[in-house]
């Protein structure tokens, strides 16, 4: 009898051990297969830029070119999803031809930026730095650059800068900076046209830090370079990553400047939930000028209003760079997550207006897509420069010899409304970004 008990006990111990081993194996497989960060993340440090006229040897150029091509082909989801890749082959061939010998660091950076621009991905490109801009107040509108007065009123269109046609400067900008849609192209031109490095690349004459600009009325004027970094005229760009809420009459307004899912955002969401639970029916979420961050901050706000967002389809590509930056176990392959619309939950008692502009990007654009595809409210303002379905989740890298700093996507996000392939998310109510808030208040007053 005692021997039978021992055998039975041994049997159950073996079964338990096998079960534990099976669970460990299943967990290990999940950790390996899923995009879960389990390994230590390698800190990325941006390399200090070399002087633009620093001469790279042919060997240094070739080494950096091959490093860039290898990282791109190992990392970007394009190589998983694109059935036709002849366009990339041509871009690569052009890059190789343009970097086939000794050249300056500035010229190599420009060639690399043009190569990365092929993907038309706002999350992939050279991290171009401009330290000085012409002190020319300007705005890009109707296909032209206009100088403006202190009130932002257009005066005359710019014809030449430093003796170079403004169209040649546009062409240089379009070659260097990726644009996912027409709004992105307009934003790039407005932000970049007065940068010293771009003007130098376009061949503009610069004398003693002064550039001559001619206008459509025939007038010539001299402008000098200045700091700080940007002179772009946008609704809220530069307002800083500070999120807050306030009441404007009977409207709960969230000034959502950056998608940080932090304690500050949790407190805002808690206050919003409390307000909705006690009868708040009018809400504005202002993502004008919001460059993105974590989409969890967006879903947190929707959940606080008794809403649930539809889900994106997501493709994650594993690579050595992604392993360094995210701690994935795998260095190759991909993982696909298929989103579900079944989770969508609306709250018909809440009237929601989301304000957006061309600077709204990445996770902030996702907020707009959640609202549009989930039927949660209306969008007011101008389209985002980010496509509704887009590449994203940035990884950073630097090229060893040239010190070119760049970034690249390792995921692809497909919007919940998969059949909609529009490149721009056009708001329900289109207005100048500066007028979006007033338009939202008018809509909520109806």
Enumerate the language-model features and the residues they cover.
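C-terminal "post-core" interaction segments
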Residues: 39-48, 55, 59, 66, ...
């Amino acid at each position: 009898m005692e021997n039978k008990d021992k055998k039975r006990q041994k049997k159950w111990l073996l079964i338990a051990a096998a079960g534990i081993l099976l669970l460990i194996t299943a967990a290990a497989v999940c950790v390996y297969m899923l995009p879960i960060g389990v390994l230590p993340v390698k800190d990325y440090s941006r390399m200090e830029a070399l002087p633009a006229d620093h001469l790279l040897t042919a060997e240094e150029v070739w080494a950096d070119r091959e490093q860039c091509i290898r990282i791109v082909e190992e990392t970007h989801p394009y190589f998983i999803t694109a059935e036709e890749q002849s366009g990339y082959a041509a871009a690569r061939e052009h890059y190789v031809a343009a970097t086939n010998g000794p050249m300056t660091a500035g010229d190599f950076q420009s060639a690399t930026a043009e190569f990365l621009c092929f993907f038309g991905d706002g999350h992939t490109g050279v991290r171009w730095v401009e330290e000085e801009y012409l002190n020319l107040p300007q705005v890009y509108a109707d296909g032209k650059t206009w100088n403006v007065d202190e009130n932002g009123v257009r005066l005359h269109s710019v014809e030449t800068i430093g003796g170079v046609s403004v169209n040649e400067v546009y062409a240089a900008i379009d070659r260097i900076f990726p644009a996912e849609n027409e709004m992105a192209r307009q934003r790039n031109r407005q932000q970049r046209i007065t940068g010293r490095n771009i003007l130098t690349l376009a061949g503009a004459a610069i004398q003693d830090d002064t550039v001559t600009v001619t206008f459509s009325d025939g007038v010539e004027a001299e402008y000098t370079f200045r700091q700080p970094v940007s002179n772009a005229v946008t609704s809220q760009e530069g307002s800083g990553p500070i999120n807050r809420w306030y009441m404007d009459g009977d409207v709960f307004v969230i000034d959502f400047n950056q998608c940080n899912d932090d304690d500050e955002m949790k407190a805002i969401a808690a206050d919003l939930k409390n307000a909705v639970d006690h009868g708040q029916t009018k809400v504005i979420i202002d993502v004008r000028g919001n460059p993105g961050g974590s989409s969890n901050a967006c879903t947190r706000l929707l959940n606080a209003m008794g809403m649930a967002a539809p889900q994106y389809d997501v493709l994650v590509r594993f690579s050595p760079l992604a392993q360094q930056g995210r701690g994935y176990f795998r260095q190759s392959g991909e993982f696909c997550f298929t989103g579900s619309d079944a989770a969508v939950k609306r709250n018909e008692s809440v009237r929601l207006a989301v304000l957006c502009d061309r600077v709204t990007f990445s996770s902030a654009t996702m907020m707009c897509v959640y609202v549009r595809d989930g039927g949660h409210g209306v969008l007011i303002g101008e389209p985002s420069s980010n496509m509704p379905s887009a590449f994203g989740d940035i990884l950073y890298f630097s090229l060893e010899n040239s010190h070119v700093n760049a970034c690249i996507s390792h995921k692809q996000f497909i919007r919940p409304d998969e059949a909609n392939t529009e490149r721009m998310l056009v708001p329900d109510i289109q207005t100048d970004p500066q007028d979006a808030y007033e338009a939202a208040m008018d809509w909520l007053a109806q």
